[in-house]
């Protein structure tokens, strides 16, 4: 159950904010719409609580003077530099074969956007109503972007718990080429020490942790791995370089980078 939130909106985006309020209400998220003059740094400092904001840039999350937005358009420079050879994630997920791929831990959707750009047909699964609404807004804006629009037909958003969605796929005998997992929790090394992240990533993670508290209801990813292995011929798990294996399961192959690695699990019979 999501706690009631403020929905701050500038005057020029008030109509859009009302639409977001209706969408969120349909997903059992209660918001109090507050019209303000400016959504600037000063306002955010004076309103440190977790809140949603709407301006001409769309919908975003704020807390403790920070803001977070999927903002797929900001990823365009990265996409233009990317290639099947240069991106480790592309090699790990065999994007050159244009696979059907489920991203069961969607997050902000940046990895899925990259994989769709490089040729994969991606289904993003997200259970949290606020994060899903943020992803919807990011995709909607991307559909109207001259550069991104042609890649959006390869991206499909599913508002559902990933564990339940994968169970349904298994029961319906639906198979995919790849399932991609990038669990938010836990991010600890073999000595159980918390792994340090870059400053910008830290800010995004702080807001995500406020939105998605690490409690008994949060799926830590360990439960997803064995389920994913029943559905996909290849399961790829993104981990910090020195993190423990997901579900304490040794991968069949690894791709190692400076800050992270990709652990791959193969099901040859599929």
Curated annotation (Swiss-Prot):
<feature type="binding site">
    <location>
        <begin position="126"/>
        <end position="127"/>
    </location>
    <ligand>
        <name>S-adenosyl-L-methionine</name>
    </ligand>
</feature>
<protein>
    <recommendedName>
        <fullName>Ribosomal RNA small subunit methyltransferase J</fullName>
        <ecNumber>2.1.1.242</ecNumber>
    </recommendedName>
</protein>
<comment type="similarity">
    <text>Belongs to the methyltransferase superfamily. RsmJ family.</text>
</comment>
<dbReference type="InterPro" id="IPR007536">
    <property type="entry name" value="16SrRNA_methylTrfase_J"/>
</dbReference>
<keyword id="KW-0808">Transferase</keyword>
<comment type="function">
    <text>Specifically methylates the guanosine in position 1516 of 16S rRNA.</text>
</comment>
<dbReference type="Pfam" id="PF04445">
    <property type="entry name" value="SAM_MT"/>
</dbReference>
<keyword id="KW-0963">Cytoplasm</keyword>
<dbReference type="GO" id="GO:0008990">
    <property type="term" value="F:rRNA (guanine-N2-)-methyltransferase activity"/>
</dbReference>
<dbReference type="InterPro" id="IPR029063">
    <property type="entry name" value="SAM-dependent_MTases_sf"/>
</dbReference>
<keyword id="KW-0489">Methyltransferase</keyword>
<dbReference type="GO" id="GO:0005737">
    <property type="term" value="C:cytoplasm"/>
</dbReference>
<keyword id="KW-0698">rRNA processing</keyword>
<keyword id="KW-0949">S-adenosyl-L-methionine</keyword>
<feature type="binding site">
    <location>
        <position position="182"/>
    </location>
    <ligand>
        <name>S-adenosyl-L-methionine</name>
    </ligand>
</feature>
């Amino acid at each position: 159950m999501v706690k009631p939130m403020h929905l701050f909106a500038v005057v020029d985006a008030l109509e859009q904010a009302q639409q977001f309020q209706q969408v969120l209400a349909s997903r059992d998220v209660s918001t109090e719409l507050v019209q303000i003059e400016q959504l600037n740094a000063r306002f955010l400092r004076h309103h440190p609580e977790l809140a949603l904001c709407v301006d001409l840039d769309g919908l975003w999350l704020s807390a403790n003077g920070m803001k977070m937005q999927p903002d797929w358009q900001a990823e365009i420079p990265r996409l233009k530099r990317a290639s099947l050879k240069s991106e480790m994630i592309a090699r790990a997920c065999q994007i050159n074969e244009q696979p059907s791929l489920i991203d069961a831990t969607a997050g902000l959707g940046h990895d899925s956007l990259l994989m769709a750009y490089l040729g994969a047909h991606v289904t993003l699964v997200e259970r949290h109503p606020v994060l899903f609404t943020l992803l919807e807004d990011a995709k909607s804006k991307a559909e109207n972007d001259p550069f991104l629009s042609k890649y959006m037909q390869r991206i499909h958003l599913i508002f559902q718990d990933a564990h339940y969605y994968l169970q349904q796929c298994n029961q319906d005998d639906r198979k995919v080429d790849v399932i991609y997992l990038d669990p938010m929790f836990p991010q600890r090394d073999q000595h159980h020490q918390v792994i340090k992240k870059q400053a910008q990533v830290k800010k995004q993670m702080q807001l995500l942790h406020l939105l998605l508290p690490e409690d008994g209801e949060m799926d830590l990813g360990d439960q997803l791995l064995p389920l994913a292995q029943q559905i996909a011929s290849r399961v790829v798990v993104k981990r910090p370089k020195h993190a423990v294996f997901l579900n304490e399961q040794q991968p069949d192959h690894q791709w190692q980078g400076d800050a992270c690695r990709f652990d791959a699990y193969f099901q040859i019979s599929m």
